[in-house]
A protein has these predicted regions:
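N-terminal FAD cofactor-binding segment of flavoenzymes
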Residues: 42-81
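Predominantly flavin-linked oxidoreductase catalytic cores and closely associated redox partners
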Residues: 115-258
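Short beta-strand to alpha-helix junction loop
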Residues: 93-114, 238-243
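Glycine-rich FAD pyrophosphate-binding loop
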Residues: 25-44
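Helix-loop-beta segment of a Rossmann-like dinucleotide-binding subdomain
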Residues: 84-103, 141, 231-235
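Beta1/beta-strand and adjacent pyrophosphate-binding region of the FAD-binding site
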Residues: 2-14
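Short phosphate-binding/catalytic loops that engage adenosine nucleotides
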Residues: 29, 61, 121
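N-terminal Rossmann-fold NAD(P) dinucleotide-binding loop
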Residues: 17-18
């Protein structure tokens, strides 16, 4: 088994893992990032908050992201039964950024990892964490399995779990606990937004609360694609019948505001 040593092992190459890697690399740490998937890859989580921007700037990732031309996000809109609430990020009580981005994550995450690699950060894709052990002094030994089946061991002083929904360390260390929240699921897609209005209406991220326990998200991107999703009780989504298109028509039927557009 091939073995190596680093200061910090980071699990997951998404935004949190990338920012952590960039910062630690700046501080002179020997960093290794392992990512289960290959990039680019589709994933949701496509709307940022302005608080993120200073972190991208601090670790030297902001310019590459800004140069890509992602859709700017200056606020958000929430709707329910004709009542509309706008949040304007410029109306704030503290210093800091008043805008951010709406991003297709396949592009966004690829820009982050490409920039990291240009800076000299070691990133390995299609590498799955299968086991981890911690010594009494807190140092770790983590086994990584590649798509070729080859297993390697990485020793690290620290491990950062940036795997998000993958929950790598909680699963491997038996730390998972059931959620007390109601069980929800989502159905989502990317669509060519042929009927997108001009101006702010066409680019404004919106959450249309169509029932007390369900909502539709609309996240326009700068490339003419819009992320469209429905979140609701799992039981309700599983009760829908017909083709994917037919189920989408049923879900969009809850929104008087967006049905005709999509």
């Amino acid at each position: 088994m091939r073995k190596s040593e680093v200061d910090v092992l980071i699990i997951g190459a998404g935004p949190s893992g990338s920012v952590a890697a960039a910062y630690l690399h700046q501080q002179g740490c020997k960093v290794k990032v392992v990512e289960k998937n290959s990039f680019p890859r589709f994933v949701i989580g496509e709307s940022l908050l302005p608080r993120c921007m200073e972190h991208f700037e601090e670790v030297g990732l902001l310019k590459a992201l800004n140069d890509f031309g992602f859709e700017e996000k200056h606020g958000a809109r929430f709707m329910k039964e004709g009542v509309v609430c706008h949040f304007d990020f410029s109306k704030k009580h503290t210093d800091g950024w008043n805008w951010t981005w709406q991003v297709p994550r396949a592009d966004f995450d690829k820009v982050l990892t490409d920039t990291l690699q240009e800076k000299g950060v070691d990133i390995s894709f299609q590498q799955e964490v299968i086991a981890v052990e911690f010594d009494e002094d807190g140092c770790s030994r983590t086994q990584i399995k590649g798509v070729d089946g080859v297993i390697q061991e990485i020793s690290a002083k620290f491990v950062i779990d940036s795997s998000g929904f993958g929950r790598v360390l909680p699963r491997l260390l038996g730390l998972e606990k059931p959620s007390s929240l109601a069980v929800h699921s989502s159905m989502f897609t990317h669509v060519v937004d042929k009927n997108r209005p001009q101006g702010n209406e066409g680019t404004l991220i919106t959450f249309d609360v169509v029932r007390d326990d369900s909502w539709i998200w609309v996240i326009p991107f700068s490339n003419g694609i819009t992320s469209l999703g429905f979140v609701g009780p799992t039981e309700y989504l599983e009760s829908l019948e017909g083709s994917v298109e037919a189920r989408w028509q049923q879900l969009l039927g809850h929104s008087d505001y967006y049905y005709d557009r999509f």
